[in-house]
């Protein structure tokens, strides 16, 4: 069990540019419970309030949402990724995405109450979470820039495809 926890620690250490002191990281890991998720199983479900935190230890998860009647994939989570819903964590509103296992997977689950207590008790953990969240937001924005192009590319595309807008 200790080697599995060390593996989680190493994954989390590699996910963020801000290095959390070992004692605080071990405290965070100590709050988690290991859960196995079968292929197709979910840890966070659209339409439900779930503010808890999940760390992928093994496997791959997709973040899916419904667009009308079509299910669309927004992103993927690999080992070391932290999965949480901003809707549920921040606003206590129902989740927009379903976080679904693409294969048999393992996550470590931290209840929001324990997570929030650690943020309140540890300035270093709060800094680490801020950095971690900023990193996630950076990569979501980076993904969108690659899919949609940057502002000059989008402007040129609009000129080409919708010149009437500029008349």
Task: Locate each region found by the language model.
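Cyclic nucleotide-binding regulatory module and flanking cytosolic helices
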Residues: 1-33
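Hydrophobic (often cysteine-bearing) scaffold residues that line and stabilize catalytic clefts
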Residues: 4, 52, 151
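Generic structural signal for secondary-structure transition and capping sites
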Residues: 17, 33, 37, 82, ...
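Hydrophobic residues at beta-strand termini and immediately following loops
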Residues: 35-37, 77, 110
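Polybasic "coupling" helices that flank or enter modular domains
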Residues: 100-103, 108-167
